[in-house]
Regions:
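Transmembrane beta-strands of outer-membrane beta-barrel pores
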Residues: 8-12, 63-67, 106-112, 153-159, ...
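Gram-negative outer-membrane beta-barrel transporters
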Residues: 142-144, 239, 243-247, 265-334
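Residue-level signature of outer-membrane beta-barrel architecture
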Residues: 47-49, 88-94, 141, 155, ...
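Repeated loop/turn-to-beta-strand initiation elements of outer-membrane beta-barrel proteins
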Residues: 2, 12, 50-57, 96-100, ...
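Surface-exposed extracellular loop regions of Gram-negative outer-membrane beta-barrel proteins
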Residues: 1, 51-73, 99-109, 114, ...
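Membrane-embedded beta-barrel scaffold of Gram-negative outer-membrane proteins
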Residues: 56-70, 174, 180-182, 213-267, ...
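Flexible loop and strand-edge segments within Gram-negative outer membrane beta-barrel domains
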Residues: 1-57, 63-81
Length: 334
C-alpha cells in the first residue's frame, strides 16, 4: 500500500491604520503585515507479511517548510522553519488477545529567526536546531472486546534537551452494549519556541522579555470517560461523561499581569494545572433529526509572579445546543 500527498498555502494578512490615514503629529501610520508560505509533502508505505496475524511494516516520511514574514509597526519577526520526520513501524498479533507494536522515529526541526522587538533595537537573529531520534513499544491485551488494556513506553533523545522517557496506558471496559468505560494516564513533553508560537503579541506596545533558561515543557495527564447507550422509545439516547486532568511540572508561562508594560516569557515557578469536565447527550427524536446538548466546565490555573491565578482568555463555562436534520435520501444535511 502506498500513499503520497502535497499541500501548499500562501497567505497575506494586513491590518492597522488605512493608507488614507494622516496623523496630525507627523507620526507614521501603524500597520500590520503578515505573509505566510507553507509547503508540505508526505509518503506512506506499508507491506503486510501475514494477513491472519496482521503482521505488517510501515514507513512514513514527511517534510515541511513554513516561512513567515511579519511586521507589527516597528516590530518585526521573520522565521523559516524546516521540519523532517521519518517513522518505521512494525505490528503483529500473537493471538486473538495479544498484539505488539514497535517502531523507530527521527524528527528534525530547524528554526531560522530574525526579529526586532522595538524601534530602538537592532534586528537580531537566532538559529534553533533540534534532532530527536526515538523508539517505542506498545502492548495490547484484548479480552473478547470487553476488556482492552494498552500499555506503551517511548524513549527519545533530543540534541538540545537530552533523554526523556514517555509512558502511557489506556484501559477500556465494555461489559455490555449499553455501557463502556475508558481511562488513560501518561506523560508528555514539548519543546517551546516563545516567539514562533506567540509572535501575535508583538502587536502590543508592551516590551517583550524572554528568559534565557526556558526548558522543555513536561506534564502528566489523566482522563476517564463513560458512555451510555440507553434504549428509549424505540430509539437510543447517547450519554457521554468525560473528565481530564493535566498537571504541569515544567511549563513556559506567558506573564502579562506582573508588569503592565511587559510580556514576560518565563519558566513556571509554582503550580499549573487544568481540570476539564464535559457532559453530552444526543437523541434522534425522529428519522433524520438529532438534537445534541453539551456542557463543559474548565478550571485552568497557572502561577504568575508567585500567585496562582486563572489563566486569561480561557472560558470557565461553555454550553452548546445543536439540531441536525438529514433528508431521507441523505443528500442534504442541515
Amino acid at each position: 500500500m502506498f500513499q503520497a500527498g502535497i499541500k501548499a498555502l500562501m497567505e497575506d494578512r494586513t491590518g492597522g491604520q488605512m493608507r488614507s490615514y494622516r496623523a496630525t503629529d507627523g507620526m507614521p501610520r501603524y500597520d500590520i503585515d503578515i505573509r505566510t508560505e507553507r509547503y508540505e509533502a508526505f509518503t506512506k508505505n506499508a507491506y503486510i507479511f501475514d494477513k491472519e496475524k496482521n503482521t505488517n511494516v510501515a514507513l512514513i516520511l514527511s517534510g515541511s517548510l513554513h516561512r513567515q514574514d511579519a511586521g507589527y509597526g516597528y516590530k518585526l519577526y521573520d522565521v523559516d522553519q524546516w521540519n523532517g520526520y521519518a517513522s518505521l513501524m512494525f505490528e503483529t498479533e500473537f493471538d486473538k488477545r495479544n498484539s505488539l507494536s514497535t517502531g523507530l522515529s527521527l524528527n528534525y526541526d530547524d528554526y531560522d529567526q530574525s526579529y526586532k522587538l522595538s524601534h530602538t533595537f537592532d534586528t537580531l537573529g537566532a538559529r534553533d536546531k533540534e534532532i530527536v531520534p526515538g523508539a517505542y513499544v506498545q502492548y495490547t491485551y484484548n479480552w473478547n472486546d470487553k476488556l482492552m488494556i494498552m500499555a506503551g513506553l517511548r524513549a527519545d533523545y533530543s540534541s538540545v534537551y537530552g533523554t526523556f522517557v514517555t509512558p502511557r496506558a489506556h484501559v477500556k471496559w465494555a461489559p455490555n452494549e449499553i455501557f463502556n468505560l475508558r481511562a488513560s494516564a501518561g506523560k508528555g513533553y514539548r519543546a517551546t519556541h516563545a516567539l514562533a508560537e506567540n509572535n501575535y503579541l508583538l502587536a502590543s506596545s508592551r516590551r517583550v522579555v524572554i528568559d534565557p533558561d526556558l526548558d522543555m515543557e513536561e506534564a502528566w495527564n489523566y482522563g476517564v470517560s463513560a458512555a451510555l447507550y440507553i434504549p428509549l422509545f424505540h430509539k437510543t439516547l447517547n450519554l457521554n461523561l468525560e473528565y481530564y486532568y493535566t498537571d504541569f511540572l515544567r511549563q513556559m508561562v506567558v506573564d502579562m499581569d506582573s508588569n503592565p508594560h511587559e510580556v514576560h516569557f518565563t519558566q513556571l515557578k509554582g503550580k499549573s494545572y487544568s481540570h476539564t469536565f464535559q457532559a453530552e447527550a444526543s437523541y434522534p427524536f425522529f428519522k433524520g433529526f438529532t438534537l445534541t446538548a453539551a456542557y463543559r466546565l474548565t478550571d485552568v490555573k497557572t502561577t504568575y509572579g508567585g500567585v496562582l491565578r486563572e489563566r486569561p482568555f480561557v472560558g470557565r463555562y461553555k454550553g452548546l445546543l445543536t439540531a441536525s436534520y438529514q433528508t431521507p435520501l441523505g443528500i442534504w444535511q442541515f
